[in-house]
Amino acid sequence: MTAVVNGNSKRYSWWWDSHISPKNSKWLQENLTDMDSKVKQMIKVIEEDADSFARRAEMYYKKRPELMKLVEEFYRAYRALAERYDHATGVIRHAQQTMAEAFPNQDPMMFGEESPLGSSTDGFDPQTPDSYPPIRAPVYPDDLRKGAFGISSSHLSTVKRNIAFMEDPQSVSSGKGFKTAKARKGLNFNNVDGKEINAKVLSESERASKAEAEIVALKDALSKVQAEKEASLAQFDQNLEKLSNLESEVSRAQEDSRVLIERATRAEAEVETLRESLSKVEVEKESSLLQYQQCLQNIADLEDRISLAQKEAGEVDERANRAEAETLALKQSLVSSETDKEAALVQYQQCLKTISNLEERLHKAEEDSRLTNQRAENAEGEVESLKQKVSKLIEENEAYELQYQQCLDTIADLKLKLFHAQEETQRLSREIEDGVAKLKFAEEKCVVLERSNQNLHSELDGLLEKLGNQSHELTEKQKELGRLWTCVQEENLRFMEAETAFQTLQQLHSQSQEELSTLALELQNRSQILKDMEARNNGLQEEVQEAKDQSKSLNELNLSSAASIKSLQEEVSKLRETIQKLEAEVELRVDQRNALQQEIYCLKEELSQIGKKHQSMVEQVELVGLHPESFGSSVKELQEENSKLKEIRERESIEKTALIEKLEMMEKLVQKNLLLENSISDLNAELETIRGKLKTLEEASMSLAEEKSGLHSEKDMLISRLQSATENSKKLSEENMVLENSLFNANVELEELKSKLKSLEESCHLLNDDKTTLTSERESLLSHIDTMRKRIEDLEKEHAELKVKVLELATERESSLQKIEELGVSLNAKDCEYASFVQFSESRMNGMESTIHHLQDENQCRVREYQVELDRAHDAHIEIIVLQKCLQDWLEKSSSLIAENQDIKEASKLLEKLVSELEEENIGKQVQIDSSINCIKILRTGIYQVLMKLEIIPGIGSGDENSRDQRNMHDILNRLEDMQTMLLSIRDENQHSAIENLVLIEFLRQLKSEAVGIETEKKILEEELESQCQQLSFSRDETQKLIFVNGELTTKVNQGVNREKVLMVEIEDFHRQVLQLRDDYTILQGDNNKTLDEKAYLTKSTLQLEEEKCKLEDDISLLLSETIYQSNLIILLEDVILEKLSGAMKLNEDLDRLSIVKCKLEEEVRELGDKLKSADIANFQLQVVLEKSNAELLSARSANVHLEHEIANVKVQKEKELLEAMLMISIMQNEKSELSKAVEGLECRYKEAKAIEEDRDKQVLRLRGDYDEQVKKNSHSNEANLKLEADLMNLLMELEEIKVEKENLNQELFTERNEIELWESQSATLFGELQISAVHETLLEGLTNELVEACKNLESRSTLKDREIEQLKGRVNNLEDANKGQNDLMCKYAQAIFLLKESIQSLEKHAMLHEFENGPATETASLVDNSDGFLEIQELHLRIKAIEEAITKKLAMEELKTSSARRSRRRNGSLRKQNHEIYSEETEMITKDIVLDQVSDCSSYGISTRDILKIEDDHSLEAKSQNPPKGKSLSEESLVVDKLEISDRFTDPNKDANKRKVLERLNSDLQKLSNLHVAVEDLKIKVETEEKDEKGKENEYETIKGQINEAEEALEKLLSINRKLVTKVQNGFERSDGSKSSMDLDENESSRRRRISEQARRGSEKIGRLQLEIQRLQFLLLKLEGDREDRAKAKISDSKTRILLRDYIYSGVRGERRKRIKKRFAFCGCVQPPPSP
């Protein structure tokens, strides 16, 4: 039973996994992934944030439908999961019931919460269903038949039904067929009845499960919706409470402000009563006392107002804090909603866990099948009712969400109101400061009056006492105010700042009193001076009275204008928002300008790097024909111009700041004018006259606004022209880039040809070495002389063919150089044309500058008039200043770019001259080579004479002259040796015949081994010759291809030249216009002294530029400067446009304020009720109009955004179309026509502007007359006001009470009036803005396209310029390499002469033996260091003659000395030893030559040949030190091939040869590693520089850096390994020399040598891999330089990789060849020594 119980623990896990596990159910997996994605989208939408609450509300309303959609989809997915879960649980319950009936003896498995313990009897965890064994594992048919469990047949039928019910066909087919087949086999007693019952049970269970799943899902949905409803209701209630709290707080704050205002009015009344009492006491002293009282009154009023303003500011701060707290609460609510969602996800996971727990309870499923029909029907009804409820709840939820949104709207409105209140407080504080300034001015006048009073000296003391009493009274009142302040401080701690301000005012008052006392003392001392001032006293008293009147009117206006200030502040806030939007657009433009400036900065850095090389090229500049002194002076002059222009720019910035301060003063004056108009409006008689004047002013302002719009349009046209000019310059730069690319390709081709020439030269050297080895072998092997001669002749023919090919390549190189020179001539012609163009453009720019200066003077005059009259014409002056800055920036940048361009040109010229100088050096070296050839001819004649003396017939063959010389020398040596051998044979025939036979046998063995080695080497040589022939054919094909490409490039260059000519003709028209503007600018400069100096400097610069026509100024510099200037001008003009718009808005605001003041005064006196009705109607109409205007503005802004996106897309597309120059030509033509049209339009607009300015002047004169009339009327009214002061005081008291009553009404009307005023002001501004925006859109569309194209042209030009510079550098490097190659050839010729000299010395030793016996051999000096090589060759010729004489003497002596055979034999043995020593020295020199040949392969890696020579010298010295003292003959060394046939005495040469080979390999590896180290350092520098320039590709450069560091580490490891191997080889071979006797030690040494050679071979392979890796990194760097340079850089990278791979591929072959060559040590460059007998 335990087995059955264990099987029950997870009996239906297979079915449960198919319904629940996401791995087995694709539907579940997709549903879960969909839910996850929806949740992430919802979180993303909720997490979005904004700067302000209003923005957040807008975002919420925009994202609300998206959120609703996501929530609905999430709910649907969750509902589907719930239905699936309910279906599964229902099936499980039915299965549990049927199993309980089938197996009553078993313990029933509890389902859901029915299990008290929650675990099965077998100890398995119910929460881990996957860990149980399969359900049907223990159920087998044999067990069932045996009745092991005691189950009856009825029970078995029920079991069979249960199993049939549980066996889904899908599960059977899913991999459990074996066990299910067993179960069916054991339980299939009644198949037919079981199947029918199972089908019914399945259908009924499915219906019931579906219905129950729907019920459960709907219940869950209802519970969730209700929970959400409750949460939303709670949030709604909270928000309502917060709103009510805010409203109550606002009302409290308003009440507090009212109470404070009432207290302030009471305090003012008390101050006025005090003033009246003081006036009664001081009737006798009316003038001075009245003035002082008024000052005190003004101070008190201002203090009260300051306190009120500070209180209001504190209240506003409190409101702002509360609003911020509300926003935080809302954020917290959002966070809580997110946590609720997370909790829902957690609950879902818990549901999944409970689903896994319910797997164990699958035994009660059959009983529920009977009741499924009834439940299904009931469930369907419940489902329908629940669906209706759910829909209702969803609707209620939506309604609550709408209410929540309304609450958010109200909160946003309250925040806006708080913001407006803050602005009002700031405005009031500013007005109070203005009042304080006026009071100070009045106090100064009072001081002057007190000085003028002579008779009041004695009375001043009494007045001071009275003033003290008054100050005591004021201090008492101030104490009362202090008490009030303490009350306010208890309410809000922020009013402390107001108290400190009040105390500072008191201190100022006390200071003024002290100053009065000091002034009184001064009056006593200066009484005589004041007598003369009595006449002026009366006038000053009148002025003081006027100031009193003004102060009173200002006090009244401060109270009455509070409401108007609030409305104006609201307008100002809206205008500020519009200004912020415009500033954002301006920032975008500024970013574009900064991007262009960064690109220009990059170009400047590159040009500065080129300029660093200028110092080294000054001497070469003199060779070219340029004068460096004049060039430096011109550069200095341009720098001085640049500095002066910078100073001008700084001055203009200072002027701009001054103008901004003037603008602020203008705003203050405008406010003062408004206050004055309000004071004048109190007089009913003067109101009508002022209304007429206001109408005229409104008309004038409208005309001014129209004029400004016209000026804006004119500026836009100017901007379009400037942009077209930038595009022209960019097109020219692109064409120059094409030319530079062509030059660069030509240089690359030349480099390839040079590299091929080097390879061919190396191959020639190798062939020469092969020839020498073959001749030496011919001497040793007399039997193979004929065959070897034939092969040598073939090799000589091939060598001649190679020379012919080399000459052909040289002619091709000369033709390519001629083509390059032709291109340089064409560029010079272009530069000449450009010089004329520069002069023309400068004259035109002078005209533009003169016109601009003229306009500046006119605008300055107007500004002065308006400052005196109305101070409203400052915008024109600002525009002129902006234009001056633009021009100055343009001049600075143009001068800097001209200087840079000149530097580049001079560098290019210097490089070309360097090329020519290098060619001349090559020619000189060729002459030296010819002289050396002549010397060799002289030596040949001497050798021929020696042959004739020796009676040797010279060889007449078809080979080369070098081979003939070698043959002749060999014949001479052979003849001499034959003579010696003949003598020895005659002397020793009888005595040593046996010894000679043994020697001959050994010699024959050696000859056999040598013959075998020679045959193998011949085969290898034949294969190498074939490979070289293939390489030559490949190089021919490449040269033909390069010639074809060069022809195509020349055609392209010619086409570019023609295009440039056409563009130059088109550009000349544009520069004429620029010259006209410059003339106008010079006219304006004549007005000012500073501008006169600048004009003189500019004229000097223009004259210098005209003198420098022949110095080839480049087209691109001016065009680049013009484009940069125009881009800056566009940005500055846009700033000017924005400032103009702001000025127009300010004018409209001024007019609106005047109209508002009129309407308010009329409404307060006459028609309050009628105004409310009309305000409602007008408000509705204006709302409609404003909605339309807002819609239009939104559409315009969206259009602008769309245009910006289109501009970005166009940029991306245009970058791919840089090389389409034909399209650019057509665009240039269109731009030319547009520029001409724009110039005409500008001229017409300029005339219109002049007419408008004349009308404006007339209007100014009219206003001046009106103003004079007003002044007169004001003087009369002021006299009347003096009489009516007492009456006005009483009336003011009554008016204050009336105003208190009216304020309640005004507060209700404020909101509506503010809205009406806002609509009126905004409608007027918006309609104007719409018209302007329509014009701007049309202009900006064209301008943006033109700017994009211009920017691309500039970039392409800059890249082409860089390429040209790089090409010239490469060209110079190639010529330097060629020069070095010629130097190497000369060194080799010198070495050949040196070897000839040594061979002659050996001849002398053979010929004149007695001289060598008498004294040691003197060492000969090398010809490498001797400058006069011809004399050395003559000396050699004389020595050859001496050898002839010596030989003749020797023959005569031999005939006489036949008797002394043994003695001569010993002498000959000593001579042989000397020959061996000489031979060893010669082999060392030959290895040195071979190492030099080997090093020449490394030239492609960037190491100079001088350094390589130094390295090889060091290696040669080491090799000399390491060689054993005893030399080896060639025959001994050639025996290394077959070790078995070599005797013990030839082991030492084999070891030395192995050692030499290993050392040569290690030395070559070391050289390669040093070259790779230099390449890695260059890559590091290049990566760092390019990473600084390109900031968008840091990741790619970091990866490359990492790879470079890895390569560097590998290099260091290989270097250390190489050093260790070198030390091992040296130490190991030295040890081997001492252990020759024992064979065991020899075997160990040979194994160790093999290991060392194997390690060396592996090291060379690793070095090869490292070379490929570094080449790959170089290719990556070339690839990262940009998409624009893909073609050119692809060619560069291909050429570089070809060269480097070729060197790498053939390096091994050449190294092996050199090793084989080094085996055969040549006696000299052309002679092989004889083998030792």
From Swiss-Prot:
Coiled-coil regions, chain positions: 195-816, 897-931, 960-1043, 1196-1386, 1553-1627, 1653-1686
SUPFAM superfamilies hit by this protein: Tropomyosin
Domain NAB, chain residue ranges per copy: 12-92
MF term (GO), any: actin binding
Swiss-Prot/TrEMBL keywords: Coiled coil
Highest rank taxon of the organism: Eukaryota
Residue ranges of the region described as Disordered: 1456-1476, 1628-1656
Cellular component annotations (GO), alphabetically ordered: membrane
Function statement: Plant-specific actin binding protein. May be part of a membrane-cytoskeletal adapter complex.
Record-stated family: Belongs to the NET family.
Name of protein: Protein NETWORKED 1D
Species: Arabidopsis thaliana
Gene name in the database record: NET1D
